[in-house]
Amino acid sequence: MSLTERIGQTPKAYELANERGPFSVEVYLNPGTSNTYQYVATTRNKFNNTDYDDLPWNYTSGKKVVTATGVVSGGERYVFLLRSEIAQDIQVTMYNTNGGSNPLNNSNVTRSNVDSSSYYQQPPQVVYNNGDLYGSRTGYSGAELGASIDKGIASLWGYLKQPLVMVGIAAVVGYLIYRYYYMSRPIGFGSSGAYDVPLLDTPLLRDSYRLPQSFTRDPLFRNSV
C-alpha cells in the first residue's frame, strides 16, 4: 500500500515502528519531480520537541530506497520525516523487512501468507507536527479535519452570498412566512377549519368578516345561533 502526498517545507513524518523491539523498514520514495527533497529517521519524541532544522537531514532527488533500522524502547516510536523546499508530490511505500520465522509486527504489520522471509508491507501512517496521527485509510487528522470544515464553510458562504442566490433565499423565506401567517389562521367563526384571513389583524378587517346587523336582529337568526 502506497501513500502519495504533497510534501512541502513543513515536515511530514511517517511512523516506522510503535512497539518495543528491533525493527527494519525499507522506505521507497518516488517523487513526481526532479526537485531535491530531504529525509531523516528519528524518534517521535525528537520530532515533537526539536527544531526541525536541528535534525540530521539527508538531501536527495529522484527515486530512493532508504533502509531504516533501530530498536524501539518502551513508550517510544520511530518516524521517517520528509520535507521539500519546493512543494512536490512524493509516493511513499513502506515494507517491514524483519526476517525469521516470527517477524516482528511493528507498525501494525500483518504477516505474509506466502513465506516468512518475504516482505511485509505496512500502510504508511503520517504524524503531523501537532502530534496527530492518522492512517492512509482513516481520513484526516484533527487539525486537517478542522481546516477542511473551515474550507467547506467558506466555500458554502461564498456560494450563498451571490446576489441571485440571496434573492432566491429571500423569496423562499418570504413565501414560507406568507404561508404561515396568511394561510394558517381560521376566519372569525370558531374553529371551522376555514383558513383564509389577511395577515394584518386590525379591527377594520375583523369587522369586515362580521355579518350585517340586520341579520343579527332577525329572530330566526338569533334562534338558529
UniProtKB/Swiss-Prot annotation:
Iron-sulfur as a keyword of this entry, yes or no, is no
Q: Which domain of life is it from?
A: Viruses
Signal peptide extent: none
Keyword check for Zinc, yes or no.
no
Q: Can you tell me where the transmembrane regions are?
A: 156-178
Q: Which GO terms describe its cellular component?
A: membrane
Q: Which UniProt keywords apply?
A: Glycoprotein, Membrane, Transmembrane, Transmembrane helix
- Carbohydrate-modified residues: N48, N58, N105, N108
Task: State the compartments where it is located.
Answer: Membrane
Q: What is its main location?
A: membrane
Membrane topology of the entry? Single-pass membrane protein
Q: Which family does it belong to?
A: Belongs to the ascovirus HvAv ORF58 family.
Name of the protein in question? Uncharacterized protein ORF58
**The species this protein was found in:** Heliothis virescens ascovirus 3e
